[in-house]
Each structure stands twice: as C-alpha cells, then as structure tokens.
Design a protein with these regions (language model features):
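Flexible, small-residue-rich helix->loop connector segments that border functional cores
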Residues: 44, 59-66, 79-92, 114-118, ...
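Substrate-binding/access-modulating region of protease and related hydrolase catalytic domains
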Residues: 39, 46, 50-52, 61, ...
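Protease zymogen maturation seam
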Residues: 1-55, 63-69, 73, 102, ...
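Surface-exposed or secretory-pathway low-complexity segments enriched in glycine-proline
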Residues: 399-406, 413-442
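Active-site-adjacent substrate-recognition loops and nearby beta-strands
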Residues: 110, 115, 138, 166-170, ...
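Short Gly/aromatic-enriched secondary-structure transition segments
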Residues: 69-79, 398
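Proline-enriched interdomain boundary motifs that mark the N-terminal boundary
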Residues: 388-397
C-alpha cells in the first residue's frame, strides 16, 4: 500500500478539508483525528479518476443538476434534452426525464426547492462525482481529472420535501435505473432500525422491492465492465441494528467511521454490516466542529458546499470507490460478474479491529468499542486497494519492523497449485532488508 506526497493532485480549493479522502492527522482541522483514517484515494487517482460511461443512480432527494461542481458530471438523456417538451421522446414510458426522473412527484422535472428539501441527494452526489480539477469547490471520488472524464450521476428522486415515493414507485425507480444504464444504485435511505427484524419479514412485507433489487443486480448492460449491477445502502443512524433494506443480503450495507478509525456515535452495526467508510461524527469532536463531518456539495441556499454526517455520507464513499473501480476496469478492458465485483469491493479494506478496544467518550455518553468488533463490516474501504484488485494485483498493508505472515488464500482463493513470483531488485531488497519465504498457503515477509 502507498500514500501520496504532500502536493495535491487536483486544484479544487476545498480538497484539503476533505479528510475522508486524505487524512494527515492535522489536529488544527479537528480533534480527535488519526493519520490514515481515509479512503486512500489519492494514490488511486494516479491510475484512474473516473469514466463517463459509468453511471451511478443516486436514489435520494433530487440532485441539483445545475450545481457548479456537479453539472459537468450529470447523466443526460440526450433524446429528451433535444426532444419536445411534454413528449416521451425516447419511448421509455417517462416524459422529460432529462437528468433522471422524479418518482416522488411522478414527473420528469428533478426538484430541490421544496421547503423541506435538505440538499441530502446533492451532498451524496458530490462525494461520488463532484468535478475534479476545475479550480472550484470539492473533489468527487470518481469525478474525473477536469477533462469531462468523471462518472455520471443519474438523479432517481424518491423524496421531494414532504413528498415521498411509495414502495411500488421505488420499484419503478429501480427498473428505470436498470433500463437507462446505471451500474451502481446508491441508496442513503431505509427503514428505522428494528422496523423489520429478519430477511423473512422483509421478503414478506417488501418482496417486490427485493425482486427489483435482483433485477438490477442480474441484468446485463451493454458495454458495461460489470455484467449486472451493485446496490449500496446506508446502515442507518440509530446506534442499533442495521436497518432494512441495508440488512438484506443481496445489497452492500455500509457503516460509518469518525476521523480516528472509531465507529461514529450514531452508526448502526451488527452482522449484516458489510463494509465501513468515513461518515463523520459531529458530537464526538471538540466544540461540535463541522470539520469532523464530510464536506461535499449542497444547495445554493446553503452556500453550495457544506458538512454533513451520517451513514448517508459513508455510503457514497463506497459507491464512489466502486464507480472508480468500474472506471478502471473499463480502462483495462476487463469485465466482472456482480458477485465477483462485490467480493472485490468488500475485500478492498483496511482492518478496523485493532482500533476497537477500550471506550470512546463523546458529548452524549460513552461507547464500549469492543461491542463493535466484527460488526462494522469487513473493514474500511480503500480506493487504492480496489484498483489493485481490479488490475489483479492485491494490495496488502504490512507493518514496518516486524515479521508479517500473509494468507495467500485470502487474496487468491485456492492456492494449492499457485505459482508465486516475487520481483524485487537487489538494490531495493538490500535497502529495505527484505526476505520472502513461502510455506504452504502462507507467504512470510521479514
């Protein structure tokens, strides 16, 4: 694993406040904080920054498609953009669906100006694909390099102020996203913890939704490097069991981390959790500092950029890394099956268990961190490891100055007939003092 130098790759002025991308442990930004508690995206950007053929459907409030830092990376239905107002120009059953569709109001116009709109969907979208290297605002994980090469955001609006789509409309939304080419369904929404307590109850009460998920996951899209789709959900914010649909096995359930590898005060957790990502932690940091939250795009009334926290904010980090992974796969000419790609996402992590000891004190009480061990998912998402997995080169983090044993089967599967070659120049080997031995399924570096 590598970490980049001090010079930012892009010129976006707020990138240095996005600790969730690169955390230097700067206590003048926020405290407590630990270096390295981030998604390690800067070294990943050396290989790939996005691809406009990759579409992420943001199922949420409407995305402000006119936002200065999002407009260039919005998905556009060209047939409707260049067609006649009030006419279903592309014959897909939806009129004027230029940037997606408003399923909350059953109309083509995406909205964000209802009195109760919060900018939630716009914030989520910015984490995934705010335009990079454009000299303004923030960066998106797969927002490109400033050359119209970021992944595209499709707005699948299911909330509009006091309006909310029904389950049947949610199902329509998922089928729409599938048919219009989205490979990733980003879902920072769900039922409260405890509203549904088992997969059986979920299927009994919301089987049409589960069937729509299966359709999204298993339907091939022409030209996509993923022979299907991946669905990514926020675990929820009640500090309890993961809510549904996030807890349903076919989707990816994302928990939230603070700035120091500890679980966010609010995050849901438990065995259904699949993976963790930065989501911020307002009530953990001194003086309730906003800087310990996630910085992204918001509505114009809120100043275009703002901090938010929640599993709603951790979830798009995983969607963004998945989008970056698919972009790199497209660049390399590789294709993956849905289960294969999901496994790669969940394996592209850094271990959290070493940080889950003792207690965490916050403004509202104390957390016993041991209770979270093994219940936050496979680990903290790492963008660099994701791209190395796509390339076929597993990235493994080891500690300096101590022997490290690596289980090859964890990274390569059945290793009974594996031929392992280590290529290190004599100069590097001598400088680092490396030795490398293989015994059975284990490789040992000293």
């Amino acid at each position: 694993n590598t970490r980049s130098g001090e010079t930012p790759k892009f010129n976006d002025p707020m990138l240095n406040k996005q600790w969730h991308y690169k955390n230097t442990g700067d206590e003048t930004l926020v405290s407590p904080i630990k270096e390295g508690c981030d998604i390690n995206v800067e070294p990943a950007w050396e290989f790939c920054t996005g691809d406009p053929s990759i579409i992420v459907a943001v199922m949420d409030e409407g995305v402000m498609y006119k936002h200065e830092d999002l407009a260039a990376n919005m998905w556009v239905n060209q047939a409707e953009l260049n067609g006649q107002k009030g006419v279903d120009d592309d014959g897909n059953g939806y009129v004027d669906d230029v940037y997606g569709y408003n399923f909350a109001k059953d109309q083509g116009d995406i909205t964000w100006t209802d009195p109760e709109d919060s900018g939630h969907g716009t914030h989520v979208a910015g984490t995934i694909s705010a335009v990079n290297n454009n000299g303004i605002g923030v960066c998106g994980i797969a927002g490109g390099s400033g050359n119209n090469d970021g992944v595209k955001i499709m707005s699948i609006q299911i909330f509009a102020g006091r309006y909310q789509s029904t389950i049947s409309r949610n199902v329509d939304a998922i089928y729409y996203a599938t048919s219009m080419g989205a490979s990733i369904l980003q879902c920072s929404w769900g039922l409260m913890s405890g509203a549904i307590n088992s997969d059986e109850q979920y299927l009994d009460e919301r089987s049409i939704e589960a069937n729509a998920f299966a359709h999204f996951i298993n339907t091939k899209r022409p030209g996509s490097p993923l022979n299907g789709g991946i669905i990514i959900f926020a675990a929820g914010n009640e500090a309890g069991a993961c809510g549904y649909p996030a807890a349903y096995p076919s989707v990816v359930c994302v928990t939230s981390l603070s700035t120091d590898f500890t679980p966010s005060v609010f995050t849901n957790y438990g065995m259904p959790a699949d993976i963790a990502a930065p989501g911020g932690d307002l009530y953990y940091h001194k003086n309730h500092s906003d800087a310990g939250q996630v910085l992204s795009t918001v509505l114009k009334l809120d100043g275009m950029y703002a901090y938010m926290s929640g599993t709603s904010m951790s979830c798009p980090h995983v969607s963004g890394v998945a989008a970056l992974g698919l972009s790199y796969a497209k660049q390399l000419g590789k294709t993956f099956e849905p289960d294969e790609f999901r496994d790669m996402v969940l394996a592209s992590v850094n271990d959290l268990d070493p940080y889950l000891t003792g207690v965490k004190k916050h403004n509202n009480g104390t957390m016993n961190l041991v209770e979270y061990k093994g219940k936050m998912g496979s680990g903290m998402i790492d963008a660099y490891k994701m791209l190395m997995a796509v390339r076929g080169t597993p990235a493994i983090t080891v500690e300096q100055d101590k022997p490290t044993t690596i289980s090859l089967s964890k990274y390569y599967g059945d290793v009974t007939a594996l031929s392992c070659t280590l290529e290190v120049s004599d100069a590097v080997k001598d400088k680092l003092g490396l030795t490398f031995t293989v015994e059975g399924n284990n490789a040992t570096i000293t």
